[in-house]
Curated annotation (Swiss-Prot):
Molecular function terms, GO-annotated: ATP binding; ATP hydrolysis activity; calcium ion transmembrane transporter activity; calmodulin binding; metal ion binding; P-type calcium transporter activity; P-type calcium transporter activity involved in regulation of presynaptic cytosolic calcium ion concentration
Active site feature: D473
Regions of this protein lying in the Extracellular compartment: 119-155, 385-417, 870-879, 944-961, 1025-1034
Annotated organism of origin: Homo sapiens
Topology Cytoplasmic: residue spans: 1-97, 177-364, 436-849, 901-920, 984-1002, 1057-1220
Function field: ATP-driven Ca(2+) ion pump involved in the maintenance of basal intracellular Ca(2+) levels at the presynaptic terminals. Uses ATP as an energy source to transport cytosolic Ca(2+) ions across the plasma membrane to the extracellular compartment. May counter-transport protons, but the mechanism and the stoichiometry of this Ca(2+)/H(+) exchange remains to be established.
Subunit structure: Interacts with PDZD11. Interacts (via N-terminus) with YWHAE.
Entry keyword set: ATP-binding, Calcium, Calcium transport, Calmodulin-binding, Cell membrane, Cell projection, Disease variant, Ion transport, Magnesium, Membrane, Metal-binding, Neurodegeneration, Nucleotide-binding, Phosphoprotein, Synapse, Translocase, Transmembrane, Transmembrane helix, Transport
Name listed for the protein in its UniProt record: Plasma membrane calcium-transporting ATPase 3
Residue ranges of the region described as Disordered: 1-23, 298-355, 1166-1186
Amino acid sequence: MGDMANSSIEFHPKPQQQRDVPQAGGFGCTLAELRTLMELRGAEALQKIEEAYGDVSGLCRRLKTSPTEGLADNTNDLEKRRQIYGQNFIPPKQPKTFLQLVWEALQDVTLIILEVAAIVSLGLSFYAPPGEESEACGNVSGGAEDEGEAEAGWIEGAAILLSVICVVLVTAFNDWSKEKQFRGLQSRIEQEQKFTVIRNGQLLQVPVAALVVGDIAQVKYGDLLPADGVLIQANDLKIDESSLTGESDHVRKSADKDPMLLSGTHVMEGSGRMVVTAVGVNSQTGIIFTLLGAGGEEEEKKDKKGKQQDGAMESSQTKAKKQDGAVAMEMQPLKSAEGGEMEEREKKKANAPKKEKSVLQGKLTKLAVQIGKAGLVMSAITVIILVLYFVIETFVVEGRTWLAECTPVYVQYFVKFFIIGVTVLVVAVPEGLPLAVTISLAYSVKKMMKDNNLVRHLDACETMGNATAICSDKTGTLTTNRMTVVQSYLGDTHYKEIPAPSALTPKILDLLVHAISINSAYTTKILPPEKEGALPRQVGNKTECALLGFVLDLKRDFQPVREQIPEDKLYKVYTFNSVRKSMSTVIRMPDGGFRLFSKGASEILLKKCTNILNSNGELRGFRPRDRDDMVRKIIEPMACDGLRTICIAYRDFSAGQEPDWDNENEVVGDLTCIAVVGIEDPVRPEVPEAIRKCQRAGITVRMVTGDNINTARAIAAKCGIIQPGEDFLCLEGKEFNRRIRNEKGEIEQERLDKVWPKLRVLARSSPTDKHTLVKGIIDSTTGEQRQVVAVTGDGTNDGPALKKADVGFAMGIAGTDVAKEASDIILTDDNFTSIVKAVMWGRNVYDSISKFLQFQLTVNVVAVIVAFTGACITQDSPLKAVQMLWVNLIMDTFASLALATEPPTESLLLRKPYGRDKPLISRTMMKNILGHAVYQLAIIFTLLFVGELFFDIDSGRNAPLHSPPSEHYTIIFNTFVMMQLFNEINARKIHGERNVFDGIFSNPIFCTIVLGTFGIQIVIVQFGGKPFSCSPLSTEQWLWCLFVGVGELVWGQVIATIPTSQLKCLKEAGHGPGKDEMTDEELAEGEEEIDHAERELRRGQILWFRGLNRIQTQIRVVKAFRSSLYEGLEKPESKTSIHNFMATPEFLINDYTHNIPLIDDTDVDENEERLRAPPPPSPNQNNNAIDSGIYLTTHVTKSATSSVFSSSPGSPLHSVETSL
């Protein structure tokens, strides 16, 4: 049989090697022997098997297993195997305890500085700078000593320590809940991943962790191999081993050439059967993980940030990051055939920047920079005004000279002014934003699980809210994927229902039963129903299940045929793939000849038919004219009824004329048509309504299918994707390519832009067509807004399109492991309606963040202006240090929790998507922010300057330093908090709706937080005393504060009345970053790709990491210094009490990147290194040409970037290589 792709081993070991040597636990192989064997490849491996075991059957005997029956499924035997050979599981790293996480949080440099600052401020509260009593220094040096000074200083130090404790606890809790959520998600995915094995002669689906050495495993297209093994039998098997070897080409496997299969590799084509020889830490991938894990722990001690040590491990292709902040690990290629050049190329690809899909992150980045700039300008102006005010008053108005002894006092003032400037900057940054984004995404992801959406990449959740187009598969997503044959053409007769067996000639019936039974995957079966009265269970490929069901409907059974001709007796198999669109199987006949059975798409296979069986079962000629008649009279009517048409044919080869089996075109030709069947796959009843919802929501749904154009059009009409009378396009793949390519065969974006807006159905399409369409829509700039595209996929070849899409949906039931790995969200029920729910949740996330932004920016605008004017006019702040701590730390945190957990409503689907370019802060939101800021500032300044007259109380404006808290400033603080509390209710609506209470009781978290905050505020005001700079208020004063707060709701209605369109002066904010703002260095990254979307979003990632994190870190560091410096230099009795305002410890959640990716958590340093890496060289400058290597390039890069999720050492081996 030579080079046959389908090779099976004849089990005849050599006589001298038939003696099985009993070894470990009664088995004939030791663990070390098997590990050594699996390190070999190709001819070397075959030679070793031959020398040591005779052949694969000898190896099976040594392992006490049967190549056809498998293990006996005996619990004791399985347990014994686990003890001797290990279990298919990598021992998990122990989760960190809460105290360990607290200790880690304390290691933060900023917090250490804050801790030191707190201790120093406690010590310095008793320190008096020299020269403060000197008359020569003028009135700046103050007057009488205050007894409460030491106490007040102690309170300031305690306030800083309190803020540190709060930050540490919140950070530790965040990390703990993140780790818990990740482990929960990981274990759920692990339980769902199963693999097919043969035990007791029965095909069983077992969890991958239950695989043992000696199991006989069925390998099929799309599988991710969970263990190492040796092939027993293979049909046209091709494996992608790039994850281990760095070899990008698919490797053909056969029992007589290269039988070694490795865990973590993907089956790209064909099927087969293997005996498992190594599992868990003893498999090739497991050995690498173990080595890396050991190196990782040492490395972790050296470098907490997880930077990778140079050396052997850097030449890796696959990167597997440990989720819990551990070291990023890289797999070293095993014996790569390509040598150093290949290795270098793969390394560059592995280090290439990961595609960042999040539209939201780009907008938040831009907004953060805008806010930062505004804050910087305000703070600079504040410092300049204060310094000028002080210098003019001291040295010009009072005519004093600079004395050496007064220098510490003057320096103290200058430091104080600088601190005020920094405070204005700090107040300007919305610290609660990272937390709001984290909470909103984490909350949504958890809830989306109940809606059958398993989110693998967090940013996909919010990106889905912006989706403008969905490219959906037909089978299983829009349809039920329970297929049945309802029409057939047999023996010159078109049957509209299942024919009676007696109506068919025995020869036709016999040929049909054999063609279907043999030329189908033997793993595909029809099993009895689980419950009485239920439908029979379909296991395996659904189209083949329909054909096997047809055999049963004809009162025949396929199982006896399969027993008569077992799988290892099949001579040659041409497996189905997206290029062939057919499957063919060759068997040897008793007379020494061969018979080929073939099945496939009718219009493709009929072209290869030269004969057809007539009503008597005899051959008659089948000319092109006959074929055209058949297409017109049989196939088109079936297709117009929405049926998939499959042709079943055969061909006989006489004993003397064995063809060249590798010449497929010659072998699968000159066929005789047995039958054409029409298979029905009913539309899911809930799909038409779901598509209507999408269309109302401004989302265009397109169907991309491999089916016949008429079938696709009929199903699209049933679903509501196309409506009668609409101007739309339904194209076949060939026509689509003709329209979008130029004379040279290159894709032109201009041509694509003429096709895709009207395209609704793409039939007879290949995965490349799907990728081309998705890329073309994403890259297009023709419409009013850039498109955000979601794609569904289930096949191995859908990987490139799923990766390219903004959001890739894989099928949880029908999807292959490869498709799941490439996806962002897995639909656990394979249902289109779940995509609509994902849109709803995505829009909800976007709105939640916008709500929080509206609330937070109102607080920030007011606080900045109050701080600025307070410092410049009264040289004091109405809001004291600990009060600011309460507002910034507690209210922002609580508000982010309250606004980020709003449940989604159907009304979210009644508006158009935002798209890529829509700003984060709309003009309506800007109107709300500025409108409420005007109201709040008017109230606060009125209270500040005339409040004491209105309430008939003492003014707090000119109170000496460290004097008891005044009622005046307490009223201002209380009113400020009340206004924020009621404005939080206003912030629930961001599109100008009037009823801000709509659905408020459906969110118990919001109600609890608002009431809880109000309760704590009462405690602070009435019993806070000196630590909170509060004086108890009377009932009347409380009622006035509440009255002003409720005024926010009334004022909100006034603002809603003003039409936004009339306010031309309002600008939107928070657009996505534009190309013109990018640096040359950033533009150089990924230069070979003509992909503006990726370029734009990659820049968002760079800015986010480099910009916001650094700004926030610098702010926190300066703030920490501010607190300690101030306490050291504070003049004891300055009438200008800026002191209380300045030592405001703020709550800042640690870096955005640290908090957001609960699932896809990547270390900042690691990301920065990746982002600075040079772009990978383009394999082919013409990215649009047919041969541009789209698939290979995308796939190779993915293994470096997508294994983030898998790398938790707790995952079983099957998930070592996937993002799952």
